[in-house]
């Protein structure tokens, strides 16, 4: 399945999970005050700008050099398209899943990352600030600047951020920082004699999150 088809699948999966939880709510246990349910504001959707600083300790050359000839670091820019569902609720935090498709490019190279992960968000601090963290895994598809080939490899990412409530259904994502790793395309994948380590991904993002329903 091509990654471009995963975006509508992402939205469908989120709404399916939310609908199932709403149809099958768990009663609140007074002794623990923890419960599973999806209520108003527990589903969030976002399309936010992102910058990813991609580094690799081993320089590469030729048409399959992902970062460019003899280059070990480069900024890539693009967008995070995704959403989350918080379905587990505790007096001190909420937890759920986040699905995202991160599409970035730089120097005519491209990285497309489809990630699924668990997230935990603290109850609002000072009523409106909501710090969160998540661990995601998935598939990273990289394309070098001078070739049409794509390499699909396992990718992981660790993220932390801060959302601020602007309105009933709108949050401002003040910042999200991330660190991840993926094996990007290189000359070593095409009969090259040099092996290349995974590329490291340092990301920064922000924008708006629309909470539904």
Outline where the language-model segments fall.
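Bacterial N-terminal signal peptides
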Residues: 8-16
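Strand-connecting loop/turn motifs
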Residues: 38-42, 49, 90-94, 126-130, ...
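Gram-negative (and chloroplast) outer-membrane scaffold detector with strong preference
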Residues: 79-147, 151-156, 205-213
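Outer-membrane beta-barrel translocator domains and adjoining extracellular loop/strand segments
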Residues: 56-65, 108-114, 143-152, 184-192
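Predominantly the C-terminal beta-signal and adjacent terminal strand-loop region
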Residues: 24, 56-58, 166-213
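Short glycine/proline- and aromatic-enriched beta-strand/turn motifs that initiate or cap beta-hairpins
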Residues: 20-88, 101-103, 203-213
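Bacterial N-terminal signal peptides that target proteins for export
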Residues: 1-7
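Transmembrane beta-barrel strands of outer-membrane/channel proteins
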Residues: 43-53, 97-103, 133-139, 162, ...
């Amino acid at each position: 399945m091509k990654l471009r088809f995963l975006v509508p699948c992402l939205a469908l999966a989120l709404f399916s999970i939310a609908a199932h939880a709403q149809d099958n709510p768990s009663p609140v246990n007074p002794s623990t005050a923890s419960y599973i349910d999806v209520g108003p504001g527990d589903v969030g959707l976002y399309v936010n700008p992102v910058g990813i600083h991609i580094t690799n300790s081993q320089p590469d050359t030729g048409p399959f050099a992902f970062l460019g000839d003899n280059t070990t670091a480069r900024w890539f820019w693009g967008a995070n398209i995704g959403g989350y569902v918080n379905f587990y609720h505790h007096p001190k935090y909420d937890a759920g899943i986040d699905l995202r498709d991160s599409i970035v490019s730089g120097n005519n190279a491209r990285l497309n990352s489809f990630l699924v992960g668990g997230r935990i968000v603290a109850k609002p601090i000072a009523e409106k600030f909501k710090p969160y963290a998540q661990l995601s895994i998935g598939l990273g598809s990289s394309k070098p600047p001078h070739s049409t080939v794509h390499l699909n490899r396992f990718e992981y990412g660790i993220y932390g951020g801060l959302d601020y409530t602007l309105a009933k259904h709108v949050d401002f994502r003040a910042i999200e920082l991330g660190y991840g790793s993926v094996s990007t395309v290189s000359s070593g994948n095409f009969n090259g004699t040099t092996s290349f380590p995974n590329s490291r991904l340092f990301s920064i993002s922000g924008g708006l999150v629309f909470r539904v329903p």
